């Protein structure tokens, strides 16, 4: 049976946002096995890679904290996935997939360019179609046995401008989208600070203006905008956009962008 380091496994299962956090958490005795409560405190210890881990004493609502991003989006944009066929683009461990299932999705296509990341409980769920090593940039309608009416996007190291054209091909007319906008992967290199962090509110505003305009060009109306409740890698502020595939697409959030950025910076000013 294949084995993996405890800290790497804890990170892959979504217990921590970064490998470094996972390492520290293991050393602090925070990581235990779901099955028998066995505690692991040596980050480099190798254990079977199908060992389900959790944080000591904590009941996670979703398989990863990332699920809280989509949870917020469904609430603030008043969206429902009840009975829907959906796509989770950039599924990773499956936080967004878990949210969709817990909110009544009938079928979820969990798409990721990587492999062996989706949480075990989701792999076993008959409502989940795991599509690993799948580059969504080249997706076609025929790749999906049912037409999705809802999609979420949480991708890294790639611009949304490379994802939305493919999604437009695949998604049903009037289909809804929650897209995580990550300025660190949308801004020009000269706008990104040390360690890949963007702290300048003006850069955030510029990115949101250009991304929302691009979405309209690709056939998606932009109907809602807010900030993500969780910061991205290295503490980057990220944003949630609500899009809808429409024949006559429009940008309805343009006047709100500056205020959304201001709220985000107030929320995370001490972090």
Where are these regions (language model features)?
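A short glycine-rich, Lys/Arg-flanked "PGG" loop and its adjoining helix->strand segment in the class I
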Residues: 161-178
